[in-house]
Amino acid sequence: MAGEDHPWQGSILYNLLMSAKQKHASQEEREVRLGAQCWGCACGAQPVLGGERLSGGQARSLLYRCCFCGENHPRQGGILYSMLTNARQPSVATQAPRARFGAPCWGCACGSAEPLVGREGLPAGQAPSLLYRCCFCGEEHPRQGSILYSLLTSAQQTHVSREAPEAHRRGEWWQLSYCTQSVGGPEGLQSTQAMAFLYRSYVCGEEQPQQISVASGTPVSADQTPATPQEQPRAPWWDASPGVQRLITLKDPQVVCEAASAGLLKTLRFVKYLPCFQILPLDQQLVLVRSCWAPLLMLELAQDHLHFEMMEIPETNTTQEMLTTRRQETEGPEPAEPQATEQPQMVSAEAGHLLPAAAVQAIKSFFFKCWSLNIDTKEYAYLKGTVLFNPDLPGLQCVKYIEGLQWRTQQILTEHIRMMQREYQIRSAELNSALFLLRFINSDVVTELFFRPIIGAVSMDDMMLEMLCAKL
C-alpha cells in the first residue's frame, strides 16, 4: 500500500517482529481487555499440514492474527497450540472459581456434539480435538467418551469438596429421631447422658458416633477417645433423678408455720367477706377457694414480707450408729442428757418434711419479684381478685358471672395504675410477670412446707370447707 518492503508471513524475520510487538504492547490495550485471556477466533481452526508445502513455495504459518484482540495465536491442532492449552489449564485464574456457584462446571452439550472417531481418523487428515470450549464457564473441557473425561469424572466423584459435609449437616436434623430411638431404650444411655449426647451432636456441632454398641450401650466411633472425668457434663436442670435433687427443710419451722397460718386466716377472711363472693352458693365458693388458696396465700405472705430460711439435713452415718448401738449393748445404756435427747427428736421431726430445693426456690423467687416491684395495698387486693375469680375452673356453673368479676377487677386495677403511675403499661406488664410466676408454685409443696407440721394428715380441702363454714 505504501510502497515499503515487509517480511513474508511465516519467515524468521516476521516471527521476530511479531514477538517484539507482543512484548511491547501498550497499557491501554491491556486495560481495554475484559481481564480474561483471548482464546482466538475462527481463523485458527484451519488445520496445519505436515511436511507438505503450499502453492507458491510458502510455508504454512503456525500463528494467525486474531480478529478479536489483534494478537497472534497458535493455530488449533498444532504442537504449540497443544502446549499452550495444556499450560493454561493448571494456571487458572483465582477469580474464576469465585464466580462459580460453589461447584465445578461439568461442561455443556458441545462436548457430545462431535463423537470421537476410532482408528480410522477424521476426513482430510485432521486429528480429533479432545477438548472443547464450554458455553457456561468459557473454559475447555474434555469431550465425553474420551479417556481424559473418564479419569476426570471418576476423580470428581472420589475427591468431594470439604464444604459438602458442612452443608449436609444442616439437612441431618432427621437423625435426631433415630438417635432418640437408639439411646432411649433400656439398653441405651441414661436420660441425662442421652440429652447431653443429643445436645452435643446437634447443637454444638460435634461429630456424631457412627455405631452404638448394643452390649455396652455406649457410642463407638473411630475418632472417639475415652472422655476424662473433667470432660463429663454436669447434671442439667431437667434431670429429675433422686440423686440430683437437694432435699431441704425449714430452719425454724415453728415460727414460719405460725406466720403462714396467720396469713391463711387473713386470706380466707378477705375472700369470705367479699360481697360478690358471698352471694355465690357454697359449692361454687368451694370450687374457687380449693383451687386458688395457694396463689392467694403466696400474695398474702409476700405482702406480709415473710422471710424463711432453709437448711439441709446431713446424711446419718450408718457406721457411727452401729458402733453406738454396739456400745449400748455391751456397756449398758448411759444416762442421756436433755440436749442429747431433744436433738434427735427435732431432726427426725424435720426429716419427715423434706422438700426439693427447686420447688422451694420457686416460692422465694415469687417473693423477691413482688418485693422488688414495691406493690402497694390496693394492687395486692386487685391481684387477689384477679386470681380468685378464675372462670376456667372445672365445676363452675356461673361462668359468665365469674368472667364479669374478673374483667371488672382487672379494669379497676388498670384505672388505679393509670392514676398512680405515669408509665402504666410498663407497670401492668410487671404485675403480669409476677402473676406468671405463680404457675410454677405447687399447692402440695405449700402444704408440706407451711402446714403439714400443724395439721398432720388432714387434707387442705377439708380445712377450706371448715374455714368457710366457721366464723372467722
UniProtKB/Swiss-Prot annotation:
| SUPFAM superfamilies, alphabetized | Nuclear receptor ligand-binding domain
* Ranges occupied by sequence repeats: 1-67, 68-135, 136-202, 203-255
> What are the UniProt keywords, alphabetically?
Cytoplasm, Nucleus, Receptor, Repeat, Repressor, Transcription, Transcription regulation
Q: Where in the cell is it found?
A: Nucleus; Cytoplasm
Disordered as annotated region, ranges: 214-238, 324-343
Span(s) of short sequence motif AF-2 motif: 463-468
Where does the UniProt entry say this protein principally localizes? nucleus
Find motif (LXXLL motif 3) and give its ranges: 148-152
Q: Where is the composition biased (Polar residues)?
A: 214-231
GO molecular function (one): transcription corepressor activity
Q: Where is this region: 4 X 67 AA tandem repeats?
A: 1-255
Q: Where is the NR LBD domain?
A: 190-471
Q: In which tissues is it expressed?
A: Expressed in adult cerebral cortex, spinal cord, thymus, heart, lung, ovary, testis, adrenal gland, hypothalamus, spleen and kidney.
Per its UniProt record, what InterPro entries does this chain match? NHR-like_dom_sf (IPR035500), NR0B1/2 (IPR033544), Nucl_hrmn_rcpt_lig-bd (IPR000536), Nuclear_hrmn_rcpt (IPR001723), Nuclear_receptor_repeat (IPR025900)
Q: What is known of its domains?
A: Homodimerization involved an interaction between amino and carboxy termini involving LXXLL motifs and steroid binding domain (AF-2 motif). Heterodimerizes with NR5A1 and NROB2 through its N-terminal LXXLL motifs.
Subunit-level organization: Homodimer. Interacts with NR5A1, NR5A2, NR0B2 and with COPS2. Interacts with ESRRB; represses ESRRB activity at the GATA6 promoter.
Q: Which family does it belong to?
A: Belongs to the nuclear hormone receptor family. NR0 subfamily.
Q: What does the record give as the function of this protein?
A: Nuclear receptor that lacks a DNA-binding domain and acts as a corepressor that inhibits the transcriptional activity of other nuclear receptors through heterodimeric interactions. Component of a cascade required for the development of the hypothalamic-pituitary-adrenal-gonadal axis. May also have a role in the development of the embryo and in the maintenance of embryonic stem cell pluripotency.
Tell me what this protein is called: Nuclear receptor subfamily 0 group B member 1
- Which species is this record about? Mus musculus (Mouse)
